[in-house]
Structure formats: structure tokens, C-alpha cells
Amino acid sequence: MANIAKKYYNEERDRLVNMNTRFSSLSSMSRNLNLLALRGDLAPVFHREAEVEAIEKMLLRRTKPNVLLTGPAGCGKTAIAEALAIHIANQKVQWEYENAKAEREYNKAKSAWDAENENKPVAELTPAPVMREVPKPPLCDVVIFDLSMNALVSGTKYRGEFEEKLEGIMNDCRKDPNIVLFIDEIHQINVIGMADGAGGMGQILKPALARAEIKVIGATTTEESAILKKDKALARRFSEVEVRPLIGDKALETADSILKDYATFHHISVEDVTAEQILEMVNYHVGGVFPNNFIDVIDETMSGARFERRSSVGFADIKKTLSRMTGNIIL
């Protein structure tokens, strides 16, 4: 069964690689998040099912299927876009597998039915088997591209070069309605490309967003979303999803998973300290927004241990990192 599932994983991976080749303008300035998800290059995301479901519903809209993620800096808005890509990629492979399984079951039943009814008159035939229907998830063909604003702007020395690059991306999106752009720091589209009387990126995108020729998931902080909302016509093209920092048990469970994930990445074991203890210390000494504050501390601690060629970190190492980050002696 594992080999069968691997077959559909490979087929979906090949489809995504081919998309990168077909849509050269888009792939040269973005990351294919679905492909990264299939390769296991995206970190797992926990307790964001509600936000992912809200985005999925908005992407299915006939008009203005565009989403604006807002929330405090560091609360995990980009991670939600990655969680959506992971969900879609897994959904597609699972559907392909279940659909093929239903087809195999039908073929087996049909062969048995043919053998049983081979010499019977029509009046005595038993009911023929019917293939089990496997409903296709509505978004399982969607592919999310994380657009790099720096790649879009860089190298545009002369008037019209920026517009040409942006139009190339938009044309790629028009060719395949399953393409969704993820734009981090989306409030910048109000000013990017504004020169010599040009309207900027937002003005170029606005008609295509309204006609659903392209689909966009944008992310920005609550404060900076006001910059985007200054253009009321542009803001109306988006449906807002508020992203709140995880708290309580959800934060603890997520912190524990993040700690294990980073320990695996750095090949470091964690001794005499728990994720809950680290989270309490981070909240008390550093503040900030979870999970960004928590990740900063454990990543710096573990990278320091790797630099020193150590195989483990503990309570003392966490305190040392916090002391360095805050400038205070933490006992």
C-alpha cells in the first residue's frame, strides 16, 4: 500500500514540477508551496484549521476570491498559507489514491460479475456492480505560489520593465485558474512600481482581482493593513481573515511540536527543560508574539550548540540565550 501511495505522490510532484516549467515568469519570481509541501520542506502547522477552512471557502467564491490575512507581527500568517499548501497537497495525493482504489475494486467486482453471468439469459442477470464514487475535494488542484516582491522589483532599471514582469506573472495566472498567489507584506503593493505617474502594482492588479482573473492571498500586520485600506476600491477586492496568536493549551502543544521540529533540524537533543518552561521564560523575559518569539530563542540556542559542536541543549543554554537577547542577567 505504501508503494501505491508513493506512486500518486510522485505523479503529483511531477505535475507541480511541470507547472514550474510551463509558467516560467511566475516560477522565476516565486516558490511553489505545494511542491515544497510534498517534499517535506515546510514545517508542520498546528491549530490553524479554522483559518485554513475560512481561506478555502473564500477561494471558492465566484467573484473576488481573494483573502487578506491580518494579525500581529510574528503570529504565523505566512505559516497559515503554508498550512493550506500542505493540506491541499496531501488532499490531492489522498484523492488520487482513493479514486484508483475504487477503480480497482470496481474492476475486480466487474470481472467476478462477468464470470458469474457469462452464460445466463438477460432476464436472469444479477445487478451489475457500480464504481464507488470518490468526491473530489474542490481545491485539490489549487497550487499556491509565494511571490517574492524583491524578485519582482529587482533589475527593473527602465520604465516599463516592472510592468512587463508583473504582466508576465498575471498572464501565467490567467492561463490556469488553479494558481493562487501568496503575497506577504501585501500593503506594499500600494507603493511598489509608482514612478513617473505610474499607478503602481495595486492599480495594475485591481481590475484582474475584481474579475477573478487572478486569485491572491495577502498577509500584513493589523497596523499596516491600514495602508492597503486607504485604497478602498482595492481593499474591497479582499475578504479579511483575522489571525490571532495561539494561547493556552494550543500554544503549549504548538511549542512542543516546534521544539521537536527544530531539534530534528539541528540534530540536537533537549535535556532538563520542557517546551512549557521555555515558553514561560520567553513570555516573561522577551515578550513579543507567539510563535515568532519562541522560535527565535530555540533556533538561536540550538544553532549556537551546533557551532560549538555540542549534541544537546538544556535549561542553562536557554537562559544564556535569553540573557544575550535581553541584555539582562537571567539566573
Annotated model-derived regions:
Residues A2-L331:
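AAA+ P-loop NTPase nucleotide-binding core of proteostasis motors
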